């Protein structure tokens, strides 16, 4: 791992996977110490809990399940984040900085509206917005499983898909997540 400036002719050896993980965790640990002074949610920015969530993710990759669980528990037990109630879940998809969001980039329309550059634009049904791509169709398997419970909150984020447009047969296979701010 390169942690110091190199000369132009330097040829450092490749680090092992273990060495990389060790360096990543060291960097995160060093950062956590600096971020710990303000253990509050900083919407739109990486904060202390973002750091701890990344540590949990790295530990999962390392198969350090106890370490990952301990890091995740720190976030859960902090009380800073709250899971949505089913009644609030659908509306949460169209809002920034929800109560479950540990890290979310803050992007405003004044800075850079993600509308046609967002993942949601590619998932949206063709023609729902000007030039929407309509490249996403939920599988029949997924829709059948979803159909086993008509009260499943995920129906709240589904819309008619391309099959409906082409065949005029209602099929809720398009998703409106990530539509931009």
Residue positions per predicted region:
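Generic helix N-cap/helix-start motif at coil->alpha-helix transitions
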Residues: 10, 48-49
């Amino acid at each position: 791992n390169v942690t110091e400036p190199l000369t132009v002719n330097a040829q450092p050896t490749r680090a092992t996977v273990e060495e990389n993980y060790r360096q990543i965790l060291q960097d995160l640990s060093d950062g956590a110490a600096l971020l710990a002074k303000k253990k509050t949610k900083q919407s739109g920015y990486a904060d202390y809990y973002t750091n701890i969530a990344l540590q949990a993710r790295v530990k999962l990759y390392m198969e350090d399940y106890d370490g990952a669980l301990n890091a995740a528990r720190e976030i859960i037990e902090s009380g800073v984040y709250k899971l949505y109630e089913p009644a609030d879940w659908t509306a949460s998809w169209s809002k920034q900085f929800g109560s479950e969001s540990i890290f979310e980039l803050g992007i405003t329309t004044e800075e850079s509206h993600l509308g046609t550059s967002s993942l949601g634009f590619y998932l949206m049904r063709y023609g729902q917005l000007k030039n929407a791509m309509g490249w996403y169709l939920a599988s029949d398997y997924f829709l059948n499983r979803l159909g086993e419970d008509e009260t499943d909150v995920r129906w709240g984020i589904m819309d008619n898909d391309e099959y409906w447009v082409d065949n005029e047969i209602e099929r809720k296979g398009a998703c409106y997540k990530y539509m931009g701010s």
